[in-house]
Amino acid sequence: MDSTTKLAIGAIGIVFGDIGTSPLYAFRETFVGPNPLPIDYNHVLGVVSLIFWSMTLIVAIQYVTILMRADNKGQGGSLALVALISRSVRNTNYGWLVVLLGVFATSLFYGDSMITPAISVLSAVEGLVVVDPELQGFVIPIALVLLVGLFVLQKRGTAKVGALFAPVMIVYFTVIATLGLISIVQHPEILYALNPYYAVLFFINDGFLAFLALGSVVLAVTGSEALYSDMGHFGRGPMKLSWFGFVMPCLLLNYFGQGAMIVSLSGPEAQEAIQAPFFLLAPEMLRLPLVILATFATFIASQAVISGAFSITHQAIQLGFVPRLSVRHTSDAHSGQIYIPVINWALMVAVILLVLTFQNSSNLASAYGIAVTGAVTIDTLLMAVLLVGVWKWKWYYAAPVVIVFLIIDGAYFAANLTKVPDGGWFPLVVGLIVFTLLTTWARGRKLMRERMSEVALPIEIFAKSAHNSATRVPGTAIFMASSTAGVPSALLHNIKHNKVLHERVVILTVEISDIPYVDPAKRCEYSEIGQGIYRAILHYGFMEETNVPEGLKSMQQCGGEFDMMQTSFFLSRQTLLPSDKPGMPIWREKIFAWMLRNAATAMEFFGLPTNRVVELGSQVRI
């Protein structure tokens, strides 16, 4: 088995869980949701046709074929796309708008990562009611136990159970495809839905009701943005192979199978079957095993979304949109497997509240969709900038492509906006809160750097004056600096209060690049300023762990050498003071100050040895 096939199999277990569990509720919701459709031949074929063409246009063409070509050194996702585009449009008038769009798409993802575990696990456990209606009262308790267990297990990492993900998902996809195929063979007339005529006829006959149905049909493509975000783990080739060669055919067979079953029924029988078409495809004796298999699949889908939240948060920290948080690496073999406690517990609380508030997957479906369609629409806008600004397409080639996708994505987003009163407000509120936090932190850090640079002493002047103004003591002192310009405040405070300078003083800056990984040969820079004072820079990509002691080992190739037992680290801890200077509104200053107080220490974030760290306070007015 070649490496591409192995990676494709691995991707089936990790990447496609979200979109793979959509058949549990997507088709059903068009007929039982807030705007239910009448159950008849034309409506069933219209919905199945819409699902087929939505999956083809949005997932297969927009994401897998076009956007997956837009990788930032192998990484995908909104933030990676923004970093890629920013290098080409940084000095243009719309560069700031590109960044804001990418940050808002990322903010919407957090709302999605709260809803996905709740709706996925609930929809699977609700299958118990199909097996035995008397189990209705156990659905929410079982779902809550499973979800709490999922979040509690996060700190142990997924390395041990991750090997089971691909086999379970392969069995799951094979089973749902087989059940769908059996139903299609029994009622092959459902295959007429391959013809877009039935989707068009649906809109001609039903107009606004068909438009509202888009809000439920879009549930079939939830998880498409996650495919792009997870591209860095497996690569474009293996993911295209697994999507076109296995996942997409399996999903379509199941959707067409559900449609075939409903088409064959009428009246009360159809009304009863539409409540759980996914589970009713299976013979009665196999429904309980299908419930168990679907529960495992939703567990894996939820795991993928939670891991995605950790990964995106880590990227946002490195790119300067989120304060330093405690990031724990759960695998020595895979640097991408991380655990962020504060994100984990915040997601768990939100998911529990969602389950208790909405009570069932059908109610939750109303909240689902806005975050996904919002992110997809933003990705389409970013794609327009990518085609013209980065790939240098002529506008008359790019315009038709972008317009087609904007019409499709915009229609889905508009249809989902009608669900705001029924629960769609939730991901929007989460997105706005997260967007406010991310932009407040980025703006506050920018203002802090500007204020500190205004009063910073040039390093050359400091080196000349320090030679005669302080007693030199043995050893090496490393002063962490956020900028390569000027003297760090911790160094000035050390001179002011302690009146000493170490024999070797190193001003160290950690710089995060807008690429995921930095070539180890370009990791460090090391130069002498004079009077025993040196400038050192460590370069990292936004996907890498910023472990300074490990990074200092690479300094040997740049001319520096460090003995940790003879080295002390000096850090500055800033305190904000109110200021009359124009910067941010007071309410945002208070939010920024709160985020600054609760951020992880530089000692923890950079992996510094606790017994070798000295922290000095400083005050900043923004």
UniProtKB/Swiss-Prot annotation:
Record keywords, A-Z: Cell inner membrane, Cell membrane, Ion transport, Membrane, Potassium, Potassium transport, Symport, Transmembrane, Transmembrane helix, Transport
Matching Pfam families: K_trans, K_trans_C
Membrane topology according to the record: Multi-pass membrane protein
Broad class of where this protein is predominantly found: membrane
Catalytic activity line of the entry: K(+)(in) + H(+)(in) = K(+)(out) + H(+)(out)
Job of this protein: Transport of potassium into the cell. Likely operates as a K(+):H(+) symporter.
HAMAP family referenced in this protein's UniProt entry, alphabetically: Kup
Name of the protein: Probable potassium transport system protein Kup
Species name: Erythrobacter litoralis (strain HTCC2594)
